[in-house]
């Protein structure tokens, strides 16, 4: 009430708004795999816009989706929610779909950040592999697509749960990718969840499934200012600021789109600066030199052919 923020509704549904809830529901779309198989970025963008229209129609502001997980395990039961096993294709499709939703003043909690592709015996990989696969797909969706929300996943990153992994949420997402939005958990199903760890490490709130429902969980989560440390109070202020930013920036995205028209479809993104690599200018220079040499050879060959023709006819 102090800042005038209205009560907002965030709901699930990877291919249908309110797909797991009672009616009214949005349109039931094909799976994201089908969208990726078209290799059509404009279609993915329009998919997001149509999804955003459905969200507005049924009164949903935030979507617990889209999924940007990679198809590492073919037996994983949720592969249909995410586009592909290829990080570039998955990231490109997600970036366009998220951008489309943004034009409708809605926001997405891109999930599951990160490495969620099995129910048990989760994936083991090095940091380099992580950055070249799963994080590569998410980076395109966050940086190029401008997703305003993120949903964590339930597995360990090293020896820490990914929900309160400071290296992943604060280090990669917020510092490296300059993400300013809100981070939520996946569905909470137990009373031993370390909500304070989530907030301390860059998260914002837990999905309201079991949060605070069990007495033991109520005892562990401290809402009283007198019982909370100064560091936690400061972090809570940052968390609230990020939640408000998500809501207000979604509204800004829609207003900007309406003011600038359809041609501004690529504006909704963070600032992405491609790192300089030596081989790009080298290859361009090599192409130019090879092209000039080919043109020179063709001119010389033509002149020589004309000269020989004249000598034969003389």
PLM segments and residue spans:
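Glycoside hydrolase catalytic-domain context in secreted enzymes
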Residues: 1-314
